[in-house]
Amino acid sequence: MNLLLDTHVFLWLRHAPHKIPQHIMALYEDMHCDVFLSMASIWEMQIKNQLGKLTLDLPLNELIEQQCLDNGLQILGIESAHIYALKNLPTHHNDPFDRLILVQAQLENMKLASADSVFKHYAVDGIW
């Protein structure tokens, strides 16, 4: 199984794991489950960190590298197909990062781990 983490889920893994349902933690820790973080999430965290809206205990690049090395996290790049697919995505959600993450989960056939209730309005295999 391929699991794509929404940005807040990635941050909660480090700072508030109690907010994540146990079945998602089990998937995250399952060696047979490939866990991904979108480059869109990294971009979002960098912007929020620079604006003072997100405080990190490590520089972002170190945080990402640590999770990749320690937990096998993989980075999902942004492809042109992901961008073009946004054209057909209904506008239930206005956040550009969430919209891109949603499209990536759809096109890459990934389960999307997110507490964002707006995602239920889309054809995505979401879990929470």
Identify the function of each model-found stretch.
Residues 1-38, 51-66, 108, 117-121:
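Short, well-structured N-terminal submotif of metal-dependent ribonuclease cores
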Residues 16-17, 48, 89, 125-126:
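Residue-level signal for well-ordered alpha-helical positions
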Residues 120, 125-128:
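Basic, glycine-rich
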Residues 55-58, 70-115:
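Active-site neighborhoods of divalent-metal-dependent phosphate/nucleic-acid chemistry enzymes
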Residues 6, 44, 98, 116:
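Acidic active-site catalytic centers that drive phospho-/nucleotidyl reactions
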